Amino acid sequence: MALNLEKKQEIIKAFATKENDTGSCEVQVALLNERIKLLTEHLKANPKDHSSRLGLLELVAQRRNLLKYIKRTDHARYVVLIEKLGIKDR
């Protein structure tokens, strides 16, 4: 269920702004997005798993806060990121 190392490295490589960039907002949002997708699939198969549902809500809130920060600081970066991830603009 968790992201394996290879998948994580692919995401980091795709969204990094420079080499060895693992902590930029874009990378963090992309990793959170992938974890959210995995948890959503898990919850479809296990609808009574309430602890995972709470974890999913926390991840969504964390992603929302990071996206809000990016939108506030650099709107062009925000637009590119949500297009790459396929997230709707609120």
From Swiss-Prot:
GO terms for biological process: translation. It comes from the Bacteria. CDD domains: Ribosomal_S15p_S13e. Keywords: Ribonucleoprotein, Ribosomal protein, RNA-binding, rRNA-binding. Pfam families: Ribosomal_S15 (PF00312). The keyword Ribosomal protein applies. InterPro entries: Ribosomal_uS15 (IPR000589), Ribosomal_uS15_bac-type (IPR005290), uS15_NS1_RNA-bd_sf (IPR009068). GO terms for cellular component: cytosolic small ribosomal subunit. One of its GO terms (molecular function) is rRNA binding. NCBIfam families: S15_bact. Part of the 30S ribosomal subunit. Forms a bridge to the 50S subunit in the 70S ribosome, contacting the 23S rRNA. One of the primary rRNA binding proteins, it binds directly to 16S rRNA where it helps nucleate assembly of the platform of the 30S subunit by binding and bridging several RNA helices of the 16S rRNA. Forms an intersubunit bridge (bridge B4) with the 23S rRNA of the 50S subunit in the ribosome. Belongs to the universal ribosomal protein uS15 family. This is Small ribosomal subunit protein uS15. It comes from Helicobacter acinonychis (strain Sheeba). The gene is rpsO.
